[in-house]
Regions:
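N-terminal accessory segment detector
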Residues: 1-119, 126-144, 155-176, 182-369
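Elongated alpha-helical scaffolds
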Residues: 145-149
């Protein structure tokens, strides 16, 4: 007997297989780029959220803490990895900021002046304030990262004569963030490690002296992962340090709201980048799976007619954080995906069950209905 139900089921399976095959053509690099993009947007959105809700002074304090924490975690270890330890300190610091930022997708130029003085100039568009975001960020952010990172290089290198001189900033409408590392001929007081000299201009750019990472070691895949990790680190550290400034409750409230808004806003863009569809439960699961795979985590799908469970193992976003920090970051970050699935034409509910929180085998079961 001819069965319409059987034909519909067969067509459903065929359609599902077709969608899965289409998504399978998307490369790992596509997934990694999608994750880098949405985490970059989340950090930008979080900055605007705090700037508009909490004001310039909170922003300055927060950014100081973000960059000091990143400096203490990354500077010396990355300094050695980039092979800069043999260079004079001013030269090494300038090259470090060019290399580390270029690896993260940020354009920075290097202009050596002497063994004791070397310039860096950040080129537009600025990653930190991409797009129109630059118009909503107060100058206190610039002062926060200058004091949090640039003015601390000499301390980390145990060179009391090394300081940073800023000649141009982004929010002042000059020619963008620019300045130089200089080893003075005297020990600097704490308030002298960072200074300003707006009347100075950098030397001309010379392409032949720009530092670069070894191409054999830094493949395209490794660079894409570094770009993703760069954005994710700003989100992780941003949320952890924000709690130090405005407290846990407000951080969770504003961090979650920013995440949900970015998820809502960026679903279509990231879905299209992954060749996905704005369709049924299976489409929602394929989208979420592809995005989470872009983090380098292991992901699988269990589904029935009424719901789908996406299982994520590894949870890179909370890796190496303390138990309290892990919970804070996850509680905010999960709303990226809650917002994304709410943005579908048929709105999908997403519930996260976070297991083994304090272990390397941390697992999340994402229930989609």
């Amino acid at each position: 007997m001819f069965s319409h139900k059987k034909v519909q089921e067969d067509l459903s399976v065929t359609d599902r297989d077709t969608k899965t095959q289409k998504l399978a053509k998307i490369t790992d690099i596509d997934k990694i780029r999608a994750q880098a993009h949405i985490h970059h947007a989340y950090f930008l959105g979080l900055q605007l959220m705090i700037a508009t809700r909490k004001g310039p002074q909170v922003m300055g304090d927060w950014m100081f803490r973000v960059f000091r924490r990143l400096h203490e975690e990354k500077f010396l270890s990355s300094f050695d990895k980039l092979g800069l330890s043999h260079l004079p300190d001013a030269i090494a610091c300038a090259q470090y900021h060019v290399l580390s930022n270029n690896i993260g997708g940020v354009g920075v130029e290097y202009m050596p002046d002497s063994n004791t003085k070397a310039w860096v100039r950040f080129r537009y568009p600025r990653w930190m304030y991409h797009g129109p975001t630059i118009c909503g960020i107060p100058i206190e952010v610039s002062r926060g990262f200058l004091n949090g990172w640039y003015g601390h290089n000499g301390v980390s290198l145990k060179n009391p004569r090394l300081g940073f001189v800023c000649v141009s900033e982004d929010m002042t409408g000059e020619f963008g963030f620019c300045g130089y590392f200089k080893e003075f001929d005297y020990d600097l007081a704490e308030n002298e490690r960072l200074s300003f000299a707006q009347n100075e201009t950098p030397p001309e750019y010379d392409a032949s002296v720009q530092p670069s990472v070894p191409a054999a070691q830094w493949t395209q895949a490794r660079l894409e992962k570094a770009n993703r990790n760069y954005a994710m680190e700003y989100v992780r550290n941003g949320l952890c340090t924000l709690e130090e400034v405005i407290g846990e409750d407000q951080t969770k409230a504003l961090g979650s709201l920013a995440a949900r808004l970015i998820g809502l806003q960026y679903f279509q863009e990231t879905k299209d980048a992954l060749g996905g569809r704005d369709g049924d439960l299976h489409d929602a699961a394929l989208y979420l799976t592809a995005m989470l795979e872009g983090m380098g985590d292991a992901v699988s799908i269990n589904e029935d007619k009424a719901s789908v469970v996406v299982i994520q193992q590894g949870l890179r976003i909370t890796r190496d954080l303390s138990a309290d920090q892990s919970e804070l970051v996850f509680d905010c970050w999960k709303d990226l995906w809650v917002g994304a699935l709410q943005s579908m034409q048929t709105r999908r509910s997403l519930t996260a069950f976070h297991q083994n929180k304090d272990h390397e085998s941390a697992t999340v079961r994402w229930l989609i209905t």
